């Protein structure tokens, strides 16, 4: 299982509440349809004023090739472009991980 973890910070023109609403209601449903995506979670800080980012997204794919194909697809490009409308993508941190489940 390959996981892409991304930290996101809201753009300067959005409040945390606007960012969270847009993410949940607009962006997440779009990204949820990425080809090959098996699991998708997003977490928001309980105290956004003291957090260093506004969301942590985790997208799970069967392997790295499937993940790369998903983001190379037309929908993948649309998801990336949409993220740029509400988040500071230059500040986003991305890491690709191979996950081992210890407790489920």
Regions found by a protein language model. Name each.
Residues 1-104:
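Macromolecular interaction modules
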